[in-house]
């Protein structure tokens, strides 16, 4: 699973996910990608990202290259079951990536359009947000 090696603080506040993605909304490495088009921002866990990565690479049969453009750097905490409120914040349960609308999550290069489209469709099925397949501007079929 993806998670940071070190962090400045063990726990962080929840924060607000207002507006669209300010950066990472254009393809930078590959010719194809999937973009979040969910109406609100959301958290993607490291397990969801890993499941999507495995689904895409398995279909591509390790040809081409897959770039993961998001990283789960936000610790999500949870208190144990049947514990009363208060007495501090719970322990870190998992790591999540904050994904706002318009953010490119995965990019693929070095494979034909049909293979990339199907690989990213399988990856998108593993994610809890609405996605859109995008193609680079300088791509010629």
UniProtKB/Swiss-Prot annotation:
Coiled-coil spans in chain: none
Q: Which terms are listed as keywords in the entry?
A: Ribonucleoprotein, Ribosomal protein, RNA-binding, rRNA-binding, tRNA-binding
Alphabetically, the GO molecular function entries are:
rRNA binding; structural constituent of ribosome; tRNA binding
Q: What does the entry give for GO biological process?
A: translation
Output the Pfam families linked to this UniProt entry.
Answer: Ribosomal_L16
The organism sits in which domain of life?
Bacteria
> Which residue windows does the record flag with biased composition (Basic residues)?
1-17
Q: Which GO terms describe its cellular component?
A: cytosolic large ribosomal subunit
* Region annotated Disordered, chain positions: 1-29
Q: Which PROSITE patterns match?
A: RIBOSOMAL_L16_1, RIBOSOMAL_L16_2
Describe, as the record does, how this protein assembles with itself and its partners: Part of the 50S ribosomal subunit.
In the record, the note on similarity to other proteins reads: Belongs to the universal ribosomal protein uL16 family.
Q: What does this protein do?
A: Binds 23S rRNA and is also seen to make contacts with the A and possibly P site tRNAs.
Protein name in UniProt: Large ribosomal subunit protein uL16
Source organism: Flavobacterium psychrophilum (strain ATCC 49511 / DSM 21280 / CIP 103535 / JIP02/86)
């Amino acid at each position: 699973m993806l998670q940071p090696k070190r962090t400045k603080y063990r726990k962080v506040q929840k924060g607000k996910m207002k507006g669209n993605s300010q950066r990472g909304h254009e393809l930078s490495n590959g010719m194809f990608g999937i973009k979040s088009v969910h109406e609100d921002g959301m958290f993607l866990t490291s397990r969801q990202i890993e499941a999507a990565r495995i689904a895409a690479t398995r279909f591509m049969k390790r040809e081409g290259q897959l770039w993961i453009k998001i990283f789960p750097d936000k610790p999500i905490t949870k208190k144990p079951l049947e514990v009363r409120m208060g007495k501090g914040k719970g322990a870190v349960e998992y790591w999540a990536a904050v994904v706002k609308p318009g953010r490119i999550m995965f990019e693929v290069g070095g494979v034909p359009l049909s293979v990339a489209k199907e690989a990213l469709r399988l990856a998108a099925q593993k994610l809890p947000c609405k996605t859109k397949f995008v193609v680079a501007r300088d791509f010629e079929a």
